[in-house]
Amino acid sequence: MRKIIVGSRKSKLALTQTNWFIDQLKALGLPYEFEVKEIVTKGDVILDVTLSKVGGKGLFVKEIEHALLTKEIDMAVHSMKDMPAVLPEGLMIGCTPKRVDPRDAFISKNGASFKELAEGAILGTSSLRRSAQLLAARPDLQVKWIRGNIDTRLRKLKEEDYDAIILATAGLQRMGWDNEVITEHLDETLCVPAVGQGALAIECREDDKDLLQLLAHMNDGVTEKTVAAERVFLHKLEGGCQVPIAGYATLTENDAIELTALVGSMDGSVLLKETVVGTDPEKVGLEAADRLIKQGAKELILAANKGQQ
């Protein structure tokens, strides 16, 4: 019986996701056993500055990918939105399980909705994507950076001078906390989700054919297709955490991919948004990027990167 070593970050959410996925594999009843190896990533250690200032994408995966390449672990369970658009040579996404709710969750201190927040209220987020879109809708709000895992952020909302914070619905759902803490879900038209938000990425070595066969049982075709379109868009625009960038795709009734893509200025005064429909994930992602580039997306990205230096 083969023992599969599964790499995971140490946070409660990461371990919950990893153990959930292992349980799905165990339920297949195949001759494998599993062991979790906890790995500390740079993103877990640097908590005093915003993600965008310390290098953005890859902050939560580099050390785990190193462990994959050196064969310390066999596979890793990541949040898809933490994955860089390009993976190191020799590694691949072995499967994409079914995506859960991709929306952003709005959590306020006193139960007020986003629209009901008082003028000048303080909104906590560490995401340029969220802050740009929410400032576009409510320029009167103040954004204050907030870092830390889910528990830490919920505690800061209670104890510090935040009126509301934004978290991913998916993480709260996986922790079983969604019903008790979420004030409202932000509609995708108000706040387009991050590329891959709500999906998991199971990363492994390309040459591990045995493991790839096992992972194939857990792949969700719709999630794979839609997330692929989002990631092609992200790659073409070379966007990471340093840029207000968003992409969310769904499958229409006719099995076409519908991708809504967005790039914004840091303060939300400019939001470029396009929706592209097609059957091929790569073509849809590239088309969305090309349309936004024609509108000036590259200039916005350049300005955002300069603003982070």
UniProtKB/Swiss-Prot annotation:
Residues modified to S-(dipyrrolylmethanemethyl)cysteine: 241
Cofactor binding note: Binds 1 dipyrromethane group covalently.
Species assigned in the record: Bacillus cereus (strain ATCC 10987 / NRS 248)
EC code(s) of this entry: 2.5.1.61
Pathway(s) the chain acts in: Porphyrin-containing compound metabolism; protoporphyrin-IX biosynthesis; coproporphyrinogen-III from 5-aminolevulinate: step 2/4
Free-text function comment from the UniProt entry: Tetrapolymerization of the monopyrrole PBG into the hydroxymethylbilane pre-uroporphyrinogen in several discrete steps.
Cofactors required: dipyrromethane
Quaternary organization: Monomer.
Region forming the signal peptide: none
Molecular-function GO terms, alphabetical: hydroxymethylbilane synthase activity
Keyword Transferase on entry: yes
Keywords assigned: Porphyrin biosynthesis, Transferase
Record family assignment: Belongs to the HMBS family.
NCBIfam families per UniProt: hemC (TIGR00212)
InterPro entries given in the database record: HemC, Porphobilin_deaminase_cofac_BS, Porphobilin_deaminase_N, Porphobilinogen_deaminase_C, Porphobilinogen_deaminase_C_sf
Superkingdom as given in the UniProt entry: Bacteria
Additional information: The porphobilinogen subunits are added to the dipyrromethane group.
Annotated Gene Ontology cellular component terms: cytoplasm
KW Transferase (keyword) present: yes
Catalyzed reactions per annotation: 4 porphobilinogen + H2O = hydroxymethylbilane + 4 NH4(+)
Record protein name field: Porphobilinogen deaminase
